[in-house]
Structures are given as C-alpha cells and as structure tokens.
Amino acid sequence: MDLGIQGKNALVCAASKGLGRGCAEALAEAGVNLTICARTEKDIVDTANEIRSKYKVSVESIACDITTSEGREAALKTSGPVDILINNAGGPPPGQFRDWTREDWIKALDANMLTAIELIKSTVDEMISRKFGRIINITSAAVKSPISILGLSNGARMGLTGFCAGIARD
C-alpha cells in the first residue's frame, strides 16, 4: 500500500525496541528515511544496521537522552528537516499516588509530556512551511481508561494528549 510518504524524513524516538522500533520499521518499509534515537548506543546502532540491511532507505542513528535539551538538540541536528515525528518514551514506574514526590511528578511530566512538546515546537513550523508534516505521539490506552497504579503515566500522557488536541485546532 502506498502511503504517500516515500522519500520523507522521520525522527523516531526510543526506536531501539518496542513500539518505537515497530514504527521505525513500518516507516522504512514505506520508503521513509529515518533518524532513530535511543539511550543505549549499541542497541540503536544494531537497530539501524538491521533496518538498513532490510530496507532501501537512509537510516541515521544517535544515542541520546531525548528528555534532555542536549539530547533533543543532537537528535534534531542529526535528522535535518523532519517530515514525520514519532514521540515515544517509556513510562514512569507504577505505584501509589501517596508515595510519589514532586520530583517523581516532574520527572514523569518531563519524559512523557514536556519532551514531546519541545520536539513539536522544534519541528512544526518547518512542517507547516513545507505543507507536509505528521506528528505521532505514542501515549497509552490509559489516556482513555486510566489505571490507578499508573497515575504518573496517566497524568503526563493525558496532558500531552490534551495539549495536542488543543494545538491541532490552530
């Protein structure tokens, strides 16, 4: 099936395994050139090599912590213009809300909401100027049906979902 995205450029976060890797492989199969990132260099390099050998697309990899400004800057510098942004991050640990500190909340919001917002801010204007862009935020089914022990994740991911629903109306 032709998705009309062949030759486009995607930045896929947390792409060495799981949903991020699945997205990277599906995009590569559709002919999209990739920049993939993850924290562990060996894992992301191995993933890039495997995708590169299987599909006829360009695959750049960078080991970085996308939740830091330095990590985001490095990923964006490596990627060049981004046509497709896949925001993806692992979730915070489960637990009981009475046990979570303010720092736990800040860390969850930073990883699962604010990082994605910063990446959107860094890419959306170029997408608009090129009259093409796709932003996919991988969150959780818990944004529709919250799970009590996943309060940190519920809050951060619902925040991102609500933010994006608002800006989509711009």
Regions found by a protein language model. Name each.
Residues 9, 16-18:
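Conserved glycine-rich cofactor-binding loop
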Residues 32-46:
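Conserved glycine-rich Rossmann-like NAD(P)H-binding loop of the short-chain dehydrogenase/reductase
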Residues 88-93:
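Conserved NAD(P)H cofactor-binding loop of Rossmann-fold oxidoreductase domains
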Residues 96-98, 104-109:
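Substrate-binding pocket helix/loop in short-chain dehydrogenase/reductase
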Residues 120-121, 165:
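A short, exposed helix-loop element centered on a Lys and neighboring polar residues
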Residues 125, 169-170:
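Alpha-helical segment proximal to the catalytic Tyr-Lys
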Residues 136-159, 164-169:
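Catalytic loop of short-chain dehydrogenase/reductase
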